[in-house]
Amino acid sequence: GGCQQNGSATIVDVKVGDKVSNWNGLGVQLTSLFNIDTAPAQAGYEYIAVLVTVVNRTKNQTFNIGAQNLAEINAAYPVPPQENVDANFHALAAASTDFSASCDGQSVECGANISLYNSNSQTFSDSTNLPPQGTGYLQLMLMVPKGWKQLSVTYMPTFAADKTMTFVMTAADVTRA
């Protein structure tokens, strides 16, 4: 990858499998990306999901990440049914202002939320934030043109001004079911 100076302004080129142990209190590993079975209404596009393992290494700082109105989006456009996937996605993407994505040079929509891990119940639940010492997944959902080659997602955290982290993926990275 590129420059991986922890704590500096920018980390570029975090690729699948890459791990960043502590970046402004956040640990990440770009875990996987895969196709989502549901096809978007927009012809010539497909949905893909990107999972990033995340851990909050701070003792007392909560990190708000992704859409902050998750409950409202899921109440307005519950999934299932499948008919609500597009509306849910567009609302999620519009609310995920701390993420931007581009695919083969063109801007694409990207929705983001946290899936928190509860070690007591050994379950995951959707969340708007990552609490101190919390772990889970950052779930990114993107709508990309079919036949895409390269995808980059830039994260601009609300808790660390003027710092960005960019995840870079290629179509070859997609996990085939």
Regions found by a protein language model. Give the residues of each.
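A mature extracytoplasmic/lumenal domain signature
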Residues: S32-F34, V54, T58, G66-N69, ...
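Low-complexity, acidic Ser/Thr/Pro/Gly-rich terminal tails and inter-domain linkers that flank the onset
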Residues: I11-Y45
